[in-house]
Design a protein with these regions (language model features):
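Conserved NTP-binding catalytic cores of kinases and kinase-like/nucleotidyltransferase enzymes
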Residues: 1-86, 203-205, 319-321
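An alpha-helical support segment within catalytic cores of ATP-dependent transferases
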Residues: 7-18, 136-137, 150-192, 202, ...
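Active-site acidic catalytic loop and adjacent metal/ATP-binding pocket
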Residues: 31-44, 49-50, 82, 175-222
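ATP-binding pocket architecture of kinase catalytic cores
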Residues: 43-137
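A glycine-centered beta->alpha junction motif in the catalytic cores
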Residues: 99-112, 153-157, 276-291
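A cross-family kinase active-site recognition segment
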Residues: 111-165, 185-187, 292-295
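ATP/Mg2+ or Mg2+-diphosphate-binding catalytic cores
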Residues: 142, 276-321
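Active-site activation/catalytic loop segments of kinase-like enzymes and analogous catalytic loops
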Residues: 221-256, 271-288
Length: 321
């Protein structure tokens, strides 16, 4: 979450008048995140999150994102609930942006989660996959494997503060990944961005999954690979197989992985690391120096990519047949 677009008091008052959610007590921008502008809105009835969708979000995708949250919350998954105004509408206009109000979830995120939190998120991801099985709105993964080569080709010019051969090395890795990508694995709706900052906890209890704005229809086990990449490397950059085995065990208590999914896990982890390396590398070069949100260092995911490249098999993640 972040703030790019600022809201004037009168604009917020006009927006809130459309809802039956009580009187405004306070509102404040939320600094974390990279995609949209987010505000915490506190009224006499409850707390809410107001999201203003920025230019990187395709408005044609908003019915998918809103619909997926509605569908999953109705199925009992802990996630934000979109709030309807007095006419039943969810999408609004505020400060020149399309906007939506969703319920506020208690809890905080943890950059380096413990084992208990890993178990909770592994179980929740499986529930996400199962509960979304009958969702009917489709969305292609705009950052799926077919986008990686064009994205790398678009990264031109000098790469400040990074090894100069990094582009060539990434191209070699990418060629290998794409040549063997497991397209035939089971597919469904995935979160695609379930980093630790998108899971909220009170102590070790998961209180909600947030930020559905990369959600799409793709390989289910790829979603697990994104999770392993973002949850299982410790502060010293070492891979924590205890965390990964905990996530995988908790996931499989809800949804068993097929043998093909298990065998493909190292490749899927390589692909997930490549996806985040490339998007971070692009932002590293193309983000203006005075940008509100600073780009994340792509070398974190390049190091993860190299780890997965040496993984002998699914057992490297604590997964045995």
């Amino acid at each position: 979450m972040a703030v790019y677009t600022h809201i004037e008091d009168d604009e917020l008052a006009t927006l809130l008048a459309r809802y039956d959610i009580g009187e405004l007590l306070s509102f404040a921008g939320i600094a974390e995140g990279v995609e949209n502008s987010n505000y915490l809105v506190r009224t006499t009835t409850a707390h809410y999150i107001l999201t203003l969708y920025e230019k990187r979000v395709d408005e044609a995708d908003l019915p998918f994102f809103i619909g997926l949250m509605e569908h999953l919350s109705a199925k009992g998954l802990q996630c934000p609930v979109p709030i309807q105004d007095k006419t039943g509408a969810i999408l609004q206009t505020c400060a020149g942006r399309t906007a939506a109000m969703v319920s506020f979830l208690d809890g905080t995120s943890h950059r380096f989660p413990n084992r208990e939190k890993c178990a909770a998120v592994g179980s929740a991801l499986a529930q996400f996959h199962l509960k979304s099985d009958d969702f009917t709105i489709m969305r292609h993964n705009a950052l799926g494997p077919e986008s990686w080569a064009p994205l790398l080709a678009s990264i031109t010019g000098d790469i400040p503060d990074l090894p100069q051969d990094i582009r060539q090395n990434a191209a070699s890795q990418l060629t290998d990944i794409l040549a063997t990508w497991p397209h035939a694995l089971p597919r469904g709706f995935i979160h695609a961005d379930l980093f630790p900052n998108n899971a909220l906890f009170v102590k070790d209890k998961l209180t909600g999954i947030i930020d559905f704005y990369f959600g799409c229809h793709d390989i289910l086990a790829y979603d697990l690979a994104v999770l392993l990449n973002s949850w299982c490397f410790d502060a010293d950059s070492s891979f924590n197989v205890t965390k990964s085995s905990t996530i995988l065990s908790a996931y499989q208590e809800q949804r068993l992985l097929s043998d093909a999914e298990k065998q493909a896990l190292p490749l899927l982890c390589r692909g997930a690391a490549m996806r985040f390396f490339l998007t971070r590398l692009y932002d590293w070069i193309n983000t203006p120096a005075d940008a509100v949100v600073k780009p994340l260092n792509p070398m974190e995911y390049y190091a993860k990519l190299r780890f997965h490249d040496t993984a002998p098999g699914p057992e490297a993640y604590g997964l045995w047949s």
